[in-house]
Curated annotation (Swiss-Prot):
Reactions performed catalytically: 3'-dephospho-CoA + ATP = ADP + CoA + H(+)
Annotated binding of ATP, by residue: S14, S15, G16, K17, T18, E19
EC number: 2.7.1.24
Keyword Nucleotide-binding: yes
Ranges for domain DPCK: 6-202
Top-level taxon of origin: Bacteria
Protein name: Dephospho-CoA kinase
Keywords: ATP-binding, Coenzyme A biosynthesis, Cytoplasm, Kinase, Nucleotide-binding, Transferase
Class of this enzyme: transferase
MF annotations from Gene Ontology: ATP binding; dephospho-CoA kinase activity
GO BP: coenzyme A biosynthetic process
NCBIfam families: dephospho-CoA kinase
Annotated function: Catalyzes the phosphorylation of the 3'-hydroxyl group of dephosphocoenzyme A to form coenzyme A.
Length: 202
């Protein structure tokens, strides 16, 4: 039996990664989100949580959890703190994803294993995957989506984007690039076509 194909979906903020992963999941793929995994570590009573508290201070604890809003306020705009936080979280996230993959392979229920990894190239993790799908969208469109979804500011969008490497570089490295500058229906159709093509390689 061939190993289950490992595919990462990546892209800049508000490019459409989560929407693409939802389509893949609807079509039967196993989907895991690196962001959701990292959020699961944001509790004060774990070793990871304690390391984050030591880094950022006890004021990030709100209602017995580590506040993502408080963390974001501290690290976005402070590159050193952000990188230190990532050094704590990313190895744990990658370990969790790899363990989950091993379990999913044993289940033999899914045609594809999809992992949404926003900072895939930035943390040098692309080589673990068999293929990388990059979701691409123009900056202005992404900013509009971000502001509409989060109610945040232009500055908060720019700070989040600052951590990401250049889109041009990622386009050259990705196995598949799906553009998302049009309607949701157009984008979902492209993702479905991609799913069919990927299944054909199994």
């Amino acid at each position: 039996m061939l190993d289950l194909l490992k595919i990462s979906v990546t892209g800049d903020p508000s490019s459409g990664k989560t929407e693409a992963c939802q389509v893949f999941e609807d079509l039967g793929a196993y989907v895991i989100s690196a962001d959701k995994v990292s959020h699961s570590f944001l509790v004060p009573y774990t070793s990871v949580g304690q390391r984050i508290i030591d880094l950022l201070g006890p004021e990030i604890i709100i209602e017995n959890t580590l506040s993502r809003k408080a963390i974001a306020e501290k690290v976005f705009g402070n590159r050193d703190l952000l990188l230190s936080l990532e050094e704590i979280l990313h190895p744990e996230v990658c370990r969790f994803v790899e363990e989950k993959y091993a379990h999913v392979v044993q289940e033999q229920k899914y045609p594809l294993f999809i992992a949404e990894f926003p900072l895939l190239y930035e943390i040098q993790y692309a080589d673990w995957f068999d293929q990388v799908i990059l979701i691409s969208a123009d900056t202005g469109i992404r900013k509009e989506r971000f502001l509409k979804k989060t109610g945040g500011s232009d500055t908060s969008f720019d700070l989040r984007c600052a951590r990401f490497s250049s889109l041009e570089e990622k386009i050259l490295r990705a196995d598949v690039v799906i553009e998302n500058n049009g309607t949701k229906e157009e984008f979902r159709r492209k993702v479905k076509q991609c799913f069919k093509a990927l299944k054909g390689t199994i």
